[in-house]
Every structure is written in C-alpha cells, then in structure tokens.
C-alpha cells in the first residue's frame, strides 16, 4: 500500500496527522520559508508524544541549497542531535553551485546520520540533471527522494516522476508539492509508492489587537495574522483513497 507522509509544522499538526491516518511525518518549522529545522523543544515534544515515524528536516535557512561552511557545520550538528533523540530518519539536501548533488557533503551527512533513513528533499528539483542526481543519490545510500518532477507541482511533473521511478527501486521516489485528495489517484495509478502532502489550511490568528502599521517580517506584505494547520479531514480523505486503491 502506498505510504502517506504529511508535512507538519507543530506538535498540534503532528497529532492531527497521526490521528487521521498519516503513515509518517516530515517535521519542519517556518512554512513560509518552505520548511526549516525545527527547534529542540518541538523535536523533544514530538519525539515524546508521536508514535508514527517522524523525519525532521535539516535545513538552516530558506533560499538555495548551497551552504557556507558554517551553515553546513550546523547541519551536521543538527543531524547528530536528531540521531541522539532517536528519530528514525531525517530530510535534507545539499547542492553545488552548478546544480549537482554535493557528493562530498552528502558523504558527511550519511556518516553523521548513521542508521537513520535519509530523504533528499526538493533540492532535487533544483538539480541541473535529475537523472544524474538520482544515480548519485543511489550511490550515496539515500533512502528516498522527494520531488515534484522538477515542476511547480507534482501533477505537472508526473511524467518525469514516472521516468524516475522507472530507473529502479532505490531510492524510493516520493511525489510531493500540490498532492491532494483531488489528484492523489493519478499518482497511485502511476505507481508512486509514497506521497507527501501538507494537507493544510491557513487559519486566522486569534489576535484581536493588531498593529497594522508594523510588521515583524522583512516582507512588509507578509500576512502575520494567519497560521498554518494540518486539516485532519484532508489527511483522512487521502488515506481513504489509498486504502481503497489497495483493495482494488
């Protein structure tokens, strides 16, 4: 049966995902940055209360995936911490300035991760050649690759995702970016073994007083009065589609 991974940005989201049938959680902070390394407090809380597998993301900042030596050193420390806390896997990715997988750094990541399952995230979609990148990641021992098929969303990139799947059984190709209940069946019919979804909604902040003339963000247009939340019904609907597909 296809596996359903839900992207969660808080303890509350993780509990919702677990209650509604998620098979695994990718744990992140900062949804507006596309996911950054969670805080130690969140990591410890989730590790204590969530029983399904949780893979924290290791990403020190938003933007591109070429990191300074200092940023990369911090990533390795975060990987060691995630390993010490007992998580079964993690999510990360590093590229060279030319858009190739940085194999030298991946070797260090794999050594720091040890027995943990490593997912190479959508840095893969920024690679110059996805098929060369996949071969390199297979050689590195990566467990899975999260990809939209190098398109804005996975529905548009499904043909490339299918080509990547055809390259072999490892790493597992996990489709993500815009995967929802209304298009999930297309991925299952295409033979995708794992899918990744935010299954989320933005809810208004409960703040009554709002200083409209001031922003805490460098982006003065940023909406600081909405909050991301996993929608339990969306997770349950997707899991139901997967179960019914398996029963055919």
UniProtKB/Swiss-Prot annotation:
CC terms in the record's Gene Ontology section: cytoplasm
Keywords: Cytoplasm
Annotated signal sequence range: none
Keyword flag Cell membrane: no
Subcellular location: Cytoplasm
Record flagged with keyword Cytoplasm: yes
Subunit details: Homodimer.
Family label: Belongs to the CutC family.
HAMAP family linked to this entry: CutC
Name listed for the protein in its UniProt record: PF03932 family protein CutC
Source species taxonomy: Bacteria, Pseudomonadati, Pseudomonadota, Gammaproteobacteria, Enterobacterales
């Amino acid at each position: 049966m296809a596996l359903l991974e839900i992207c969660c940005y808080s303890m509350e989201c993780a509990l919702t995902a677990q209650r509604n049938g998620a098979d695994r959680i990718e744990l992140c902070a900062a949804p507006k940055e596309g996911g950054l390394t969670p805080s130690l407090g969140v990591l410890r809380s989730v590790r204590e209360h969530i029983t399904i597998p949780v893979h924290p993301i290791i990403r020190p900042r938003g933007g591109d995936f070429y990191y300074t030596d200092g940023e990369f050193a911090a990533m390795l420390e975060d990987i060691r911490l995630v390993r010490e806390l007992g998580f079964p896997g993690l999510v990360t990715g590093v590229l060279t300035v030319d858009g190739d997988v940085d194999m030298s750094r991946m070797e260090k990541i794999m050594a720091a991760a040890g027995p943990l399952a490593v997912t190479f995230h959508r840095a893969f979609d920024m690679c110059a050649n996805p098929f060369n990148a996949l071969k390199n990641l297979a050689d590195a021992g990566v467990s899975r690759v999260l990809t939209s098929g190098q398109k804005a969303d996975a529905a548009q990139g499904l043909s490339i995702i299918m080509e990547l799947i055809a390259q072999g059984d490892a790493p597992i190709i996990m489709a993500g970016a815009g995967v929802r209940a209304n298009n999930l069946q297309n991925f299952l019919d295409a033979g995708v073994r794992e899918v990744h979804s935010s299954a989320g909604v933005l809810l208004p902040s409960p703040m009554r007083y709002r200083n409209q003339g001031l922003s805490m963000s460098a982006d003065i247009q940023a909406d600081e009065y909405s909050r991301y939340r996993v929608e339990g019904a969306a997770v349950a609907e997707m899991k139901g589609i997967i179960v019914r597909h398996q029963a055919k």
